[in-house]
């Protein structure tokens, strides 16, 4: 079966321009497109263009950050005629099939090969060994949320042999990592097309929404800790040249950890949950509500703190408001997550309390309101609970 655009998919003008821009750049580059504008479909339209140029003989590898995105991408790939191999978790679930289909592809028995994997599996030694056997002249790589691929443990796994490289992200530049960002663009190519939030809303590609910040004061202990961390950050930054914006955190782990620790403090501020409850009590009806907790970019010890925060939020919503609230985190299995999303859309779950998993690219069209407790916005001793409200009826 050919990898091609299904008849019922009508590319929007901006998607066609994105495909043309990437092709004009020699088959390399990054698409910087606002979340919700159809980066997935745009990239698959690009792959369909490549397949047509190659007489349908193409090996396509798609790397995404999280397991639940593998399943989401798989549905779209099947719409384009692909029969993807889902390569993540245990090798026994995918390696034999991948090696078999790769052998058929090399022999010319199979026209197309499509693999969807997580960034973690992509970087693994076992996957890299298989990847090294792919015909470089017919190999295309799509990296979803490409900014993640600039991390030290991931950028080393990017295969130099592959010539067709497409990166996708609403925010391709890495936070306080100029070196990682530069190496990312050196590999994937520069940003070849941009489609921002304002333009997308103006053109009707995204719905309008209200963004409402709610100020929350830090407790006395949190304020003291925040000031101490800020002084430490200033001191460490001064040793690196004095300008935090010009500091490469990869060369200053102490500064990196201090910034993450301060972000954790703001993201899990004690009074945010109290303010959230106050706001929800003002609602006539609570349904199809997303609540974001913690900072998905923070790992290790910091991750433990944010997990406790998400648990506390869910428990409070149940106990004080009687809400049918459920967690949506990396701890839930693939089947559990799919069930949660289905129940949320049906209205059986009134609120999903999420950390990290919903931040990047998961489709939840039923959402009416989102509360973001994880905002890093702060001034002195205050932080914010941010509300997004869909204005579409």
Describe each region flagged by the PLM.
Residues 148-209:
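Post-DEXD/H (motif II) to motif III coupling segment of the RecA-like Helicase ATP-binding lobe
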């Amino acid at each position: 079966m050919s990898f091609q655009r299904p008849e019922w998919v009508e590319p929007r003008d901006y998607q066609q321009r994105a495909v043309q821009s990437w092709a004009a750049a020699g088959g390399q580059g990054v698409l910087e497109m606002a979340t919700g504008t159809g980066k997935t479909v745009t990239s698959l339209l690009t792959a369909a263009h490549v397949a047509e140029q190659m007489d349908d003989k193409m090996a396509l590898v798609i790397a995404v950050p999280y397991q639940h995105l593998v399943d989401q991408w798989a549905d779209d790939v099947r719409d384009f005629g692909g029969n993807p191999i889902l390569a993540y978790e245990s090798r026994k679930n995918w390696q034999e099939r991948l090696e078999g289909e790769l052998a058929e592809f090399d022999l010319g028995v199979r026209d197309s090969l499509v693999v969807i994997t997580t960034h973690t599996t992509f970087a693994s030694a076992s996957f890299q060994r298989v990847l090294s056997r792919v015909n470089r002249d017919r190999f295309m790589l799509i990296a979803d949320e490409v900014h993640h691929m600039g991390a030290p443990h991931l950028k080393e796994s990017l295969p130099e042999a592959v010539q067709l490289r497409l990166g996708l992200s609403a925010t391709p530049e890495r936070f306080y990592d100029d070196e990682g960002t530069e190496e990312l663009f050196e590999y994937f190519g520069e940003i070849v097309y941009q489609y921002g939030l304002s333009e997308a809303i103006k053109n009707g590609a995204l719905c309008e929404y209200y963004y409402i910040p709610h100020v929350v004061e830090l407790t006395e202990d949190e304020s003291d800790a925040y000031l101490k961390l800020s002084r430490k950050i200033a001191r460490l930054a001064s040793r690196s040249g004095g300008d935090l914006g010009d500091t490469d955190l990869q060369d200053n782990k102490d500064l990196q950890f201090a910034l993450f620790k301060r972000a954790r403090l703001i993201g899990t501020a004690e009074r945010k949950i109290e303010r959230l409850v106050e706001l929800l009590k003002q609602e006539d009806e609570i349904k199809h509500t997303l609540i974001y907790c913690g900072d998905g970019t923070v790992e290790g010890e910091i991750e433990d703190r944010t997990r406790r925060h998400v648990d506390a939020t869910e428990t409070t919503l149940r106990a004080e408001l009687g809400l049918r609230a459920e967690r949506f985190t990396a701890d839930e299995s693939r089947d559990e997550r799919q069930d949660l999303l289905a129940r949320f859309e049906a209205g059986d779950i009134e609120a999903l309390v999420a950390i990290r998993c919903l931040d990047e690219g998961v489709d939840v069209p039923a959402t009416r309101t989102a509360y973001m407790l994880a905002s890093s916005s702060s001034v002195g001793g205050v932080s914010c609970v941010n509300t997004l409200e869909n204005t579409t009826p």
